[in-house]
Amino acid sequence: IKITSVPDRWTILRPFFTKYITVFGINIFATKETPDHKIIHAANVLAQYLDNDANRLADNKEVLEELVNNNASLIMSKDENQMESLWDDFPDAVHDLFDNSLGVQDLYGSETAPSDGFDASLEEVLHLITHNGYSKVYPDVFGEQYDSEIADYMDIARGGRFAQVPSRYPSSAWYSYDDRTCDYSCMVTEYFYWALTTLLDAQNDGDRCDDISHEWKLCTPEQLEETDTGIYSLFNDKTYSLPVSYTHLTLPTN
């Protein structure tokens, strides 16, 4: 994995991003101020989500093809402030590109493999893959809408079907995301992340269980298997070639 300059195909983005990596044909654009080792770490996470057995071939070719066809792209900045400035500075042509031609997910260098705290690249990179890939290839299974298989499991996890965040979740719920800007489809995206990273044992570290309990109450694979039986079975269905190991995702960052 090597950082290069932004290719000619994406000249319109050069005023904003100076660094570029492609992973299995998926773009990572980064600002000049984003540290190289953060970019490479994000690229490694992306590579290992897609190629979890590390045989240099994508585990799910259909999902990869969809991601490439959608021009799935991770855009990275030094931190949140820089990302907000970028969105303000983008001309209409860039916003149109993102809206119509690129499947974009942003990620901050400051939240990527931090010295203390959770590695947000595990979340944001997975959102890129599930939203632009799995939900499109398998709409009846992973679609981010009512009545897909994953949405039905999410409704169980939330204690009911809620189009918007309820004023109070049922006490039986183990998924209780409370961001009121997150609509139903967004809730599915977040649920996919919480459940899969729990299966990978990525949430079971130090005080993490307490830190996330207001949104997600399962933090070990065993708890997921015992409580969220439907999603546990779905994620272990080899039809979909989802990642099964977190060890491949903790690669050196420099």
Please place each PLM-identified region on the residue numbering.
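Membrane-interface transmembrane-helix boundary segments in multi-pass integral membrane proteins
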Residues: E215-T229
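Post-HExxH zinc-binding segment in Zn-dependent metallohydrolases
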Residues: Y134-E190, L196-D205
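N-terminal low-complexity, Pro/Thr/Ser-rich intrinsically disordered segments
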Residues: I1-F16
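A short, solvent-exposed beta-edge/loop patch
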Residues: I26-N27, L199
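Acidic/His-rich structured neighborhood in mature extracellular/periplasmic domains
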Residues: G25-I26, P35-F162
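Conserved small/polar residues in nucleotide/adenosyl-binding loops
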Residues: T247-T253
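Surface-exposed intrinsically disordered loops and tails
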Residues: D207-K217
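Extracellular/periplasmic catalytic domains that process cell-envelope and extracellular macromolecules
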Residues: I21-T22, E66-N69, Y184-V188
